[in-house]
Amino acid sequence: MMQVRMQAEPQQLTLALSKGRIFEETLPLLEAAGIKVTEDPETSRKLILQTSDANVRVIIVRASDVPTYVQYGAADFGVAGKDVLLEHGGEGLYQPIDLHIAKCRMSVAVKDGFDYASAVQQGARLRVVTKYVQTAREHFAAKGVHVDLIKLYGSMELGPLVGLADAIVDLVSTGSTLRANQLVEVEHIMEISSRLVVNKAALKLKRERLQPILEAFEKASKRSS
């Protein structure tokens, strides 16, 4: 009796992205790998987007959730900011490439006129609002600054203006939002850019499909850096 050998289905890959700047700046990297996203998440209500490659799809998630989707295998790979990865901890993730996209910086800012340097020098205990609690805690601990951290999910600039906090820790790109709210940067914490993150199991099981995409991303990111 002749045995019929079934041909294996191509391995589908799922890429996790967040809307906005990271999505827009990832598109050229995908195109360098020969992949085009066929739908716009800004105009579509769909959370799963198809691409020109039938075996690659994109899921749209919150920026802070990208590492979690990749960690647990709901996505094979994703793009996330260094800020998000530091808060997540990076467990279960392979981070092979700094893509040099969505660049900004993480800084401490205060209301214009607040003498931050003197407060720190005098050992004052400062209240700080941020959504980057883990990173802020490590930063201030390393400097020996006493702080009470308050976690917010947005509108950090409002904190010092209404007396909720003395300072904020947030991402800064041009600084225009700070200036519009009479805040000034007083301390630079780190430079931020977005990284490619890959599920460790997927890297082993789907290496043949993933490797060409990873290589294309790396080459394209080097050209743009």
Swiss-Prot record:
Single GO term (MF):
ATP phosphoribosyltransferase activity
Q: According to its UniProt record, which reaction does this protein catalyse?
A: 1-(5-phospho-beta-D-ribosyl)-ATP + diphosphate = 5-phospho-alpha-D-ribose 1-diphosphate + ATP
An example GO BP is:
L-histidine biosynthetic process
- Under Enzyme Commission nomenclature, its number is 2.4.2.17
Write the record's keywords in alphabetical order, separated by commas: Amino-acid biosynthesis, ATP-binding, Cytoplasm, Glycosyltransferase, Histidine biosynthesis, Nucleotide-binding, Transferase
Primary localisation category = cytoplasm
The family this protein is said to belong to: Belongs to the ATP phosphoribosyltransferase family. Short subfamily.
Q: What is this protein called?
A: ATP phosphoribosyltransferase
Q: Which organism is it from?
A: Herminiimonas arsenicoxydans
